[in-house]
Structures are given as C-alpha cells and as structure tokens.
Amino acid sequence: MQVKNTLIKLLVAAAALFPAAVWAQTSSINAFSPYTMYGIGELNTPGTLPMRSMGGVGVAMRSTGVVNLLNPAAYSSIPQKTFLFNFGLEGQNYYNSQTVAGQSKSTAYNTFNFHDIAFQMPVARKLGLGFSLTPYSSVGYRTKYYHEYDPSDPVWGNVGRVQYNYEGEGDVTEVKLGLGWEVFKNFSVGVAAQYYWGSIDRTFTMTPTAITGEGNYTSSVGLDNYSISSVKGQVGVQWSPVLTQKRILTIGAAFDIGGDLNPEVTKRIYVGDIYNTTVKGDTTHLKMVLPRQLSAGIYYQTAKWAVGVDYAYQNWGDSNTATEMTGVSGSGDARTSYEVAYTNTSTFKVGVEYTPSRYDVRSFLKRWSYRAGFRYGYHNQTFNGDRLAQYAVTAGFGIPVKLWAISSIDVGVEYGRRGYNVAERVGLVRQQYFKFAVGFTLFAGAQENGEYWFSRPKYD
C-alpha cells in the first residue's frame, strides 16, 4: 500500500508539472538574439543541470543520481525498486553589441523559463526506461533598420524615409522516450524515440515616414507562422572496461538518426491599416531536415572525482543544402546584407566534478559536489560563408538534501560568447550571455541511503 501511494503521489506531481512546462515552452521568449532570425532559432544545450554544469558532457555518464538525456543506454543504470525524477529552471541574460557607422550600440535582455522535466525508472532486471521533456530550440528577436530619404533616387526620393521592423518568437520542444538494456556485464545498449513540436511566429513591418512627392504610400505587414511536428530516433551504447569499487571508466557513443522537419508555413501580407487588407495569403512547407548526429565520450569516476570528455558532430549543412536565407544589418549607408546557410558543426566538451567526502557526517560542505566545464564549437549557420565560433564556461554545485541521500538541489551558471571571430567583418552582433539555473533531483528507492520510499513496512 505504501509503495502504491508513493507512486501515485509522484505521478500526480509529474502530471501537474507537465502542462505547466508545456505552457512555459509555448508562451514566452526563451532566447533573445538576432541569430535566432533564421531557421528554427538557437539550439539549446541538452542535458540535466549536473551535465550542463560540466560543460554538457554525458554521452558516457552512468550515474544513479542523474537522468542521462544524451544516451539512452544509460537508462539501464537505474537500480531495481527505484525512481529518479528531475526538474529544472533556467534564467538567461543576453548582451548584444555591434559597431555601426563607427558607433558602438548594445542591447540587453533577460529571460526565465522551464528547462527540463525527466524521469528514469526500472522496467525489469537490467532494463530501464527514461522520459524527458526539454527545449530543443528557441526564437526571440526584435530588430529594425532604416532606409534613409534620398532625394536623388528616382524611387526612394518619392517614398521618403522607411523603417523596417523584424520580430519573432517561439520554440521547438523535444519529447523523448527510450529504453536501456544491459545486454551483458558492463555493456549496455539503448534506443529512444524523439518527437518534436512547436510554433514560431515572425513579423515584418515596413513603415514609410516623412513622405514626400505625389505618391501615397502606406505601411505593410508580413506575418509568418511556422508549425512544426516531426519524429526521429536515437541509438546508443555504453561500455565500462574498468568497473571496480574504487574507479569506473565508461566509453559511450550515440547516434541520432535525424529526420524531415518540413515545417508548415502560413504566410499573410497586409497593406494599409494593420490587418485590414490581405494582399496575399498561402500555406507552404519549408524544406528542412533535422541533422544526423554522432557523439562519443569517455567518463572516468572515483569516490571523489569524475572527469568527462565528449565530442559531437551534426551534419546540418549536408542535410539542408538548399536552405539559404538573406539578412540585413545596420541602417542607411552602413547597411550591409549577407547570405545565411546551414553548415556542419563540431562541438568539444570537457567537465569535472569533485565531491570531497560524500558520506562525511561532520562537514555539510564536504558532501557537496562541485562542478566545472568548458564547451567549444561552431554555430550551425554561416554568414557570407563565415562560421561563427561559440564557447562557454560552466560551473555549479549539487547539495544533497540529507545525509547519505542521492536526492539533491543543483545550482549552475554558464558564461558564453558567440560571433566575436567574424562579427566586425560581416556586420553582425557580438553576443555574450550569462545563464543561471536551478535543478531538483528526487531519488526514491530502498537503498542504504535513508530514502526508503519503496520499502514495505514491517507492519502495514
């Protein structure tokens, strides 16, 4: 009876969080960056907070207290009669700077939203199930530029000064369900199905001002809605050639199969008073493909230390060779245009975790886990053929909720930069961001850590 009641309470709590998490993913801006103007926006860093605080490593991670979102083979690590639940929140501060016509301009924006909800549980001996709901990509931007009045121009001399505004917001969410099976001692395989859905709205407004001449010019508004729904799969393996009481060495690899995204795009153009006269409206499908991804990693852990290294490759460029866009930055004489195209990406990650004394009864701080990491790679789009380098430095810590407990409260920070290598040459913004995240990990099970959620009482 106690086991049944505990499971019911836990599932009710998860069900209560699920619609709130979905609402958060579809109702507010999760990113604020001009780099999200194209495609499906900025890709989010996958993984629960302990993984992201270590630079995002995790392909080879096997841990009783961490839901692994990078490799379904890790689901087999969940012990019998246990349940692992995770929930995370994340706040972001974006700072964008740009030099236009010799003048430095900057903007800043803050966001705060849900990041992930996940759980892991055993299905049978050496067989585990994992579920996660996480943001895959985010769109959020507001930008404008001007075409200045030029009396010598035969066209613009009659129109006057024109202001162009671009706005967009939305996101793509990933739902993942998978199984991990320890086929034989120290070797596990996993498979997962991933479903992507979301909606992205983009608005373009042209407003003539200071009109001269005999012409009569009015504003025009373009509204584009991208509706996304797609399925793809993932397979993974993990092997621990060293597995003793004192140290564990695990090698892991995962492959994302990829799949057609092909968002349904509904376009509307209005002229005159806003939303008054529809000039054109149609619905098409944008040819776009989610990339295949190959990732591999090594993870080494002892009683105090854990060190991981990951590498991930995504073939965005090979999958989306026909997807090209154009963009504009600056205003007036300083206005520049560029071509945007997808490119293949490589990302390197390294992370470390240190726990001074996990079972120390005298010092609370010695039971904390301290984490740090680094990530370096490239943006998945090029601008006039130039690739944008991006890197991040991460740190965080995990606080056990009580002595010998696996359940914890996790805190993490991340500082990153993007576009500094080519921003001045191409005319783009130099972007810095700072992220602050809080995660909650709940472990329930009949373990020797005092968390006896699934133990049958002697007298019922």
Positions of PLM-derived features:
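Short hydrophobic "helix-edge" motifs at membrane interfaces and signal-peptide entry regions
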Residues: 10, 60-62, 174-175
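Outer-membrane beta-barrel porins/channels
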Residues: 25-46, 51-52, 122-460
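Generic low-complexity, intrinsically disordered sequence content enriched
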Residues: 11-15, 21, 58, 235, ...
